Design a protein with these regions (language model features):
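Extracytoplasmic/periplasmic solute-binding protein
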Residues: 106-115, 120, 146-198, 239
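Glycine-centered hinge/linker elements that transmit conformational signals in sensory
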Residues: 151-158, 195-225
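Extracytoplasmic/periplasmic substrate-recognition and gating elements
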Residues: 29, 35, 108, 211, ...
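Short, solvent-exposed loop/beta-turn-alpha elements that line the ligand-binding surface or hinge
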Residues: 84-96, 139-143, 166-170, 189-208, ...
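Conserved C-terminal helix/tail region of periplasmic/extracytoplasmic solute-binding proteins
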Residues: 314-316, 326-333, 347-401
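Conserved N-terminal structural module of periplasmic/extracytoplasmic solute-binding proteins
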Residues: 1-72, 77, 91-92, 136, ...
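Short helix-initiation/N-cap motifs at beta->coil->alpha
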Residues: 40-49, 68-69, 143-149, 222-236
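Hinge/lid segment of periplasmic solute-binding proteins
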Residues: 66-121, 148, 264-273, 335-340, ...
């Protein structure tokens, strides 16, 4: 028999011992000779615990998190075992391409085998949108709209007496995926190059988007709020759109039934507007990696665990449900068919874009981003502001590469 250690970050129910032990029991019913001990990490101290364990030669066999840790950090440091043999042709066909591309490095070595995902989106107060006759600009089945339709919706709400339609919040990095996504999507810009080596916010498409948002009445650059504050202002009716949204927000029932504002207006989740009709959403991907501790038996046992939990057709649905997120495999189907909100939201998974959070200099880029938005909001020329952003972010990327 073999014993392996799994360390998991709090990814939905994967941070709950009762839930995880249930999954381990299912694994042991099929593989009784592999003993799995689990340790639960948090996001405050987890990275330090893992790094200390790596330095001390006592890293866990398995870890559950996302590509920015498994591929871009520990994978790049050479402490992970490649999982190329798990990535069969069938797996590559079944798993979303945007997820697959995030799980390997530029050499093609896979350091993550994914289980679940989510996508961040935006939301509108559909009651108010209908009130001003702007629902004509929205494809309610696909949850998509054009950039022109978005701007016409903002204009209709503004002229309808809603002075604060939306906010480009920039007091800090909280919720910054929303401001990146609205700016990148409007005219087809990107946040980084495809190879994830440099930041590209100074492209003509991005400059046009930032300038348009700055010049649009009803959209205000607000250096006093971050994403969480924006959500509060959207829920209480101050704002009619939110750029910081996801399934957790859509399902939240703290102040009213899920899907309703505090006053009972309908909250409708939307993909970010595009000129092309092809939205690219930011998101999260979570799965498993294996630390190479030099013990082939443990690596093999850890791979057996991954295959059972994340690839076995009879098991994978329960593994994903435990996460409260969405499957990365198309074959799993709609696991939330009996939950209208979750089922409808699953449409957004097909819109997941490039997972660029694995670009070097990421921490610096995030700080430089909200600083750039603040400078634009206070009147600095957009081209000057984005040049400072890319200069500083790319200097950090070069230093880390």
């Amino acid at each position: 028999s073999t014993s392996i250690k799994l360390w998991t970050y709090p990814i939905g129910g994967w941070g709950n011992d009762e839930t995880v032990q249930g999954l381990v029991s299912s694994f042991n019913a099929k593989y009784p000779d592999i003993k799995v001990t689990v340790e639960y990490l948090d996001y405050t101290n987890g990275d330090d615990q893992v790094n200390t364990a790596i330095e001390g030669g006592s890293a866990p066999d398995l870890v559950m998190e996302g590509p920015e840790r498994l591929v871009a950090n520990w994978g790049a440091k050479g402490v992970m075992a490649p999982l190329n043999d798990l990535w069969t042709d069938d797996a590559k066909k079944d798993i979303y391409a945007s997820v697959e591309s995030a799980c390997h490095n530029e050499k093609g070595d896979y350091y993550e085998y994914p289980l679940c995902m989510t996508a961040h989106c935006m939301a509108v107060n559909m009651t108010k949108v209908k009130e001003v006759g702007a629902d004509q600009y929205i494809d309610t089945d696909k949850h998509t709209w054009s950039t022109d339709g978005f701007l016409k919706t903002v204009d209709a709400l503004y002229k309808g007496g809603y002075e604060n339609v939306a906010a480009i919040y920039c007091s800090g990095q909280g919720g910054d995926q929303g401001t990146r996504a609205i700016i990148n999507n409007m005219y087809g810009g990107t946040f980084t190059d495809a190879a994830h080596t440099k930041y590209t916010a100074d492209s003509a498409e991005n400059i046009k988007a930032i300038q348009t948002l700055h010049d649009t009445k009803g959209i205000n650059f607000d250096a006093s709020i971050a994403g969480g504050d924006e959500i509060t202002l959207f829920r209480n009716g101050t704002l009619q759109m939110a750029f910081c949204w996801n399934i957790a927000q859509q399902a939240n029932s703290d102040n009213n039934d899920a899907g309703l504002t505090n006053d009972g207006d309908e909250i409708f989740p939307m993909a970010f507007p595009t000129a092309s009709g092809d939205p690219k959403l930011c998101g999260g991907i979570w799965g498993f990696g294996i630390f190479d501790n030099g013990d082939e038996a443990k690596i093999k046992a850890a791979k057996t665990f991954i295959e059972f939990i994340a690839a076995d057709p009879a098991q994978v649905k329960d593994s994903v449900l435990a996460s409260t997120y969405f499957p990365v495999r198309t074959s799993v189907g709609d696991i939330y068919a009996d939950n209208e909100i979750m089922s409808e939201y699953s449409k957004f998974m097909a819109y997941l874009g490039d997972y660029y959070q694995i670009t070097p200099g990421w921490a610096t880029a995030r700080t430089e981003w909200w600083n750039m938005l603040q400078r634009v909001g206070s009147g600095e020329d957009v081209e000057t502001a984005v040049k400072t952003f890319v200069d500083n972010a790319n200097a950090a990327a070069a230093a880390e590469a």
